[in-house]
């Protein structure tokens, strides 16, 4: 499955890492809070990395 079509997934852990994810419905990358474990591949350290995916 295409990474960019996956919804951003926080995961079950409770850390609060700010990451970037691509939102297909908005056609852009935005910040979201990642819990720190599991989740999916729509999870990037930087806006630039997200935009290049």
UniProtKB/Swiss-Prot annotation:
Any Gene Ontology CC annotation: extracellular space
MF terms in GO: serine-type endopeptidase inhibitor activity
Function: Inhibits trypsin.
PANTHER family noted in UniProt: BPTI_KUNITZ INHIBITOR DOMAIN-CONTAINING PROTEIN (PTHR10083:SF374), KUNITZ-TYPE PROTEASE INHIBITOR-RELATED (PTHR10083)
Keyword Disulfide bond included in the entry's annotation: yes
Disulphide linkage map: 13-37, 29-50
Name of the protein described by the UniProt record: Hemolymph trypsin inhibitor B
Domain BPTI/Kunitz inhibitor: 4-53
Pfam family name, one: Kunitz_BPTI
The keyword Protein biosynthesis is annotated on this UniProt entry: no
Annotated InterPro entries: Kunitz_BPTI (IPR002223), Kunitz_BPTI_sf (IPR036880), Prtase_inh_Kunz-CS (IPR020901), TFPI/VKTCI-like (IPR050098)
SUPFAM superfamilies: BPTI-like
Protein keywords: Disulfide bond, Protease inhibitor, Serine protease inhibitor
Organism listed in the record: Manduca sexta
Site (Reactive bond for trypsin): 14-15
